[in-house]
């Protein structure tokens, strides 16, 4: 069993993945996009547990599982024993005892997965579909796949991440891996939403200072549900100060691309008519989410088979 397989018993944080593992997942995602197939004759079982709302992550994991021919065990939080007070640990312990091979989990608690992967009793592999404002590895990997398809490399690329930085698991996951891959990072958005941890990975700027220099302009959703009611800007003020207006779009380099993890607050982070503009890769990101999640599932299942 290779070191790479051993490390991918779980995929919970970009910090836990080596650059080599990341590149293998990206390239495997591209292979799946180009038509590669893998038949699973032993019918591994995957359960998706989403304790927070999701469309893209939840449904693209489901499509990835269907394309791989995996067995899906539906889990509805609303009708489960969670509503009787059952803990997440006991829920996963139960699914593990039932023979579920992989659990894809989104949960509001940061680092929820640490207790699960440390348990000697839980044998199910964990894929983190997002933990509060912590990590979102599969989103980061699909973003990387989209950038790699465009440029063929990461070294030397100027990447700006703009918006609700503090509350964004996407920003944290991407900044950690992009710095290791050799990209130059810039962070823009309201000063109230910039924690000092970002300074270790890049430079704080205003969007107008950097918009005409970057190769990748990545906007983040304003996460109203994670803010105190008094902390939210008006939509109009936010868009004027920090969003992608037509004037800012026109200043982007000829080769620059526009990204957003979605869902998008139209006319807040990005002007409505620019969401599908020629430089936008937002739809491509969604498409790539299926294929990179196929690669993640394949790698985790390969590790289980090797054990």
Curated annotation (Swiss-Prot):
Amino-acid positions noted as binding carbamoyl phosphate in the UniProt annotation, renumbered to this chain: 56-57, 106, 136, 139, 262-263
GO CC field: cytosol
UniProt keyword list: Pyrimidine biosynthesis, Transferase
Entries under SUPFAM superfamilies matching the protein: Aspartate/ornithine carbamoyltransferase (SSF53671)
Molecular-function annotations in GO: amino acid binding; aspartate carbamoyltransferase activity
Pathway connected to this protein: Pyrimidine metabolism; UMP biosynthesis via de novo pathway; (S)-dihydroorotate from bicarbonate: step 2/3
Reaction(s) catalysed (UniProt annotation): carbamoyl phosphate + L-aspartate = N-carbamoyl-L-aspartate + phosphate + H(+)
InterPro entries: Asp/Orn_carbamoyltranf_P-bd, Asp/Orn_carbamoylTrfase, Asp/Orn_carbamoylTrfase_sf, Asp_carbamoyltransf, Asp_carbamoyltransf_Asp/Orn-bd
Positions contributing to L-aspartate binding: 84, 169, 221
Disulphide linkage map: none
Keyword set includes Transferase: yes
UniProt-listed PANTHER family: ASPARTATE CARBAMOYLTRANSFERASE, ORNITHINE CARBAMOYLTRANSFERASE, MITOCHONDRIAL
Function recorded in the entry: Catalyzes the condensation of carbamoyl phosphate and aspartate to form carbamoyl aspartate and inorganic phosphate, the committed step in the de novo pyrimidine nucleotide biosynthesis pathway.
This protein's name: Aspartate carbamoyltransferase catalytic subunit
Underlying gene: pyrB
